[in-house]
Amino acid sequence: MPEQTRSYVAIDLKSFYASVECKERNLDPLTTNLVVADPERTTKTICLAVSPALKAYGIPGRARLFEVVRKVKEINDERKRKNGGHEFTGQSCDTGELKADRSFALDYITAVPRMALYMKCSTEIYNIYLKYVAPEDIHVYSIDEVFMDVTDYLNTYRMTARELAGKIIREIQQETSIAATAGIGTNLYLCKVAMDIVAKHIEPDQNGVRIAELTEISYRKLLWAHQPITDFWRVGPGYAKKLAEVGLFTMGDVARCSLGKPGEYYNEDLLYRLFGVNAELLI
């Protein structure tokens, strides 16, 4: 009897800390410019989160506070130029207001981190997961991310993995106002990569939810040539540099290298020489 194909779901809470801070202020993180950072630690402090609205201006999620200040100044200089050089008549943190009135300067809220609050919200969301999946099938990866093995639940609920993930995400949104993204795969790696890379580049469904799926075959078709390679789970700049030094720039390159025959330059042994036992993360 063939082994059952397993279904894994990864769920990531979108800009979690920033979304919680917006929720506490009855604001929408999709339209509110907000960063989570402690300005008393100097402007070199790293922002724990940036709201999706502010990210849309090109500000990365883990920027230093001085980078946010600099980018906002650049944006306002450009807004003033497009407004004929006139002085601003006001300022706003809301993207709708900023689009409607060019005489407003872009502003943002700086929220001091409140870890106890984030843990409380994360626990509330974990309890939503428990409505659908037993704790032994949930792996908490971080405060805002989980993996779930949903294989044994699909027949019970008479749902596909996509339908179950969508139902869970919609309940999170309804109960906590926190948006989430999901990846689905036949193993943990594929569901994580589906969430991290593919879901970010697809249009949301009619409920505003992004869910991406990968199989071994679709992974090869969609992502073997994807760059930068650092977008992939567990491939940091150090790994990417070592791979580039031997002419490997994509996951397709790595896969072909791992299939090389003994005695050839590109083979599994090359990866083990470069990374030791950690080569197993790539092969």
State where each predicted segment sits.
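Gly/Gly-Pro- and Ser/Thr-rich, intrinsically disordered tail segments characteristic of DNA damage-repair
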Residues: M1-L282
